[in-house]
Amino acid sequence: VIQPMILEENPLNRDVLWHKVYNLLRDHGQKGMPIQALSGVDIALWDILGKVTGLSISRLIGGRFREQVPVYGYGMMLRREKLPALMDRFEDEAAAIKSSGFVATKMKVGLGSKQDVQLAESVRRGVGGDFPFMVDANHCYTVDQALYVGRALEELDAYWFEEPVAPEDLDGTKNYVPS
């Protein structure tokens, strides 16, 4: 879909090409595959511009504002393991991420609310009480489940709770959002 639109175009016209592709894709939604496809084109265009000019991306977008950027380690992915094995692995991975010099860590959940709380407890044990950890749910909960997990994460001092419910679950969330 995108290739015929940009194949003979000058890749240095990054803004023009980006808007041309975006205008074609925006009717298909502003998330998911259309935007992921546009992101791939955008990255390629920036890469081409950097190679042609011999400049880093930071220089192309206005200059470097810092020499170091704090980053978090992402691990603790779900696998087909029994819960005790997952808990042990999550605790060990979290500890390893902390000892590697990251400023925080993020874990994946999605087994079920009670099991996920146990996994979060394992991560907290692995990193100790003074290290930020985040939880990525990828919309795996109903609102009631998200509230249950969210309260438990608050007790564990989780730094953030990402995407607990599907954004289109308007019926589920309307009772929990102040008018």
Write out the residue ranges for each language-model feature:
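Non-catalytic positions within long, well-ordered alpha-helices that form the structural scaffold/packing
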Residues: A95-K98, E154
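Subtilisin-like serine protease catalytic core
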Residues: V52, G62-F65, V177
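Active-site mouth loops of central-metabolism enzymes
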Residues: E67-E91, V109-G110, A137-V143
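N-terminal small/glycine-rich loop or linker at the start of catalytic domains
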Residues: S58-L83, L119, R124-D130
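Metal- or metallocofactor-binding catalytic centers and their adjacent structured scaffolds
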Residues: V1-V52
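Catalytic core of soluble alpha/beta enzymes
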Residues: M107-S179
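A structural motif
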Residues: S99-A104, A158
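Conserved, mostly hydrophobic/aromatic
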Residues: I2, V41, G54, T105, ...
